[in-house]
Amino acid sequence: MNDSVKTSLKRTLVGKVVSNKMDKTVTVLVEHRVKHPIYGKYVVRSKKYHAHDEANTYNEGDLVEIQETRPLSKTKAWTVSRLVEAARII
């Protein structure tokens, strides 16, 4: 028998951190554009995800990539995989 290597393709999304008030958790706002079926206009749809941040390193305004994982709590099934762009401090 052949030993097959199991490769799992986990979903990844890119979004903006809108809250880091929870311990080891950030709220990430993910926006995507969808074409309206009747009018043809592109509409921005958004959804918020709770993502695991083990070291509490990400701040509000950071652009991060999140990756799907096993359920970590009732509302948290994503982890922050990397920082895409840090927030500008004015």
From Swiss-Prot:
CDD domains: Ribosomal_uS17. This is Small ribosomal subunit protein uS17. InterPro entries: NA-bd_OB-fold, Ribosomal_uS17, Ribosomal_uS17_bact/chlr, Ribosomal_uS17_CS. The gene is rpsQ. One of its GO terms (biological process) is translation. One of the primary rRNA binding proteins, it binds specifically to the 5'-end of 16S ribosomal RNA. GO terms for molecular function: rRNA binding; structural constituent of ribosome. Belongs to the universal ribosomal protein uS17 family. GO terms for cellular component: cytosolic small ribosomal subunit. Pfam families: Ribosomal_S17. Part of the 30S ribosomal subunit. It comes from Paraburkholderia phymatum (strain DSM 17167 / CIP 108236 / LMG 21445 / STM815) (Burkholderia phymatum). Keywords: Ribonucleoprotein, Ribosomal protein, RNA-binding, rRNA-binding.
